[in-house]
C-alpha cells in the first residue's frame, strides 16, 4: 500500500461523512484515521522528520566528516606526497622522524620503554611468522648490509660503547639461561665454528689463529683466581675426554683390523 492509496482512503472516508450529513467526527472514524496516519509515518519513507531505516548509511563505509574518513583522506594525501618527493626530501623527512623518535624515546620512563620494546618484539614476531623463505633471506641480507654500513660509520667511542653494551647483555643472558639452553648454545656455536673453518681460506685461517691467540692472552692476563681454577678444571676434563675418545678410536680401528683378518683368514697364528 502506497502513501497515495492511504491518502485516498482517508479522503473517501471524509467524503462519506459529508454525504451522510455527519458534521461531527465519530470516535470510530477518528481511530481509523489515527491508525492510517501512524502507518504512513512508520512505514513510508519521507513521511516524517525522523530518518528512515533505508536512509541510514552503511557502517562498513566511513561517513563523511567522521574520524575514519578524515584519517583515510590524510593517509591517501600522505602517500601521494611521498610518491612525488625527491631523494633529498626523503632523507630530510627520515632524519627529522629519527630525531623526533630519539627525543621521544629519551623522555620516556622505564615502564614506557619496556612496553615499547614489548610491542616491537610482538610486531616483529607476527611479521616474521607470515613472511616466506625468500622474504626472510632478503630481510637477513638487508639487515647484515645495514649493520656493515653502520659499523663503518661509527666512531671509536661509539664502537667501544656498543661492545660494552653487547658484553653486558651477553653476561645477563648467560646468567639467566638453563643448563639445557647452555648445552644447546655451545653445540650450535661449535657447529657454526666447524662450518666456518671448513670454508675459510688459508689467510682467513691464519688470521683466526692470531685472533684466538691474542684473545686467549688477554683473557689470561685479566682472569681472577676463581676463573683460573675453573679453567684448569675444564681443561683437565677436556683432556681426559679427548684421551678417552682417542683410545676408543684406536680400539675401534684395531677391532676392525682383527675382524677383517678373521673374515679373510689371514690372521697370523690361525
Swiss-Prot record:
Region Disordered, annotated ranges: 1-270
Signal peptide region: none
Polar residues compositional bias, start-end: 21-40, 260-270
Biased composition range(s): Basic and acidic residues: 1-10, 64-74, 83-100, 113-131, 154-169, 182-215, 225-238
Name assigned to this protein: Uncharacterized protein C05D11.13
Organism: Caenorhabditis elegans
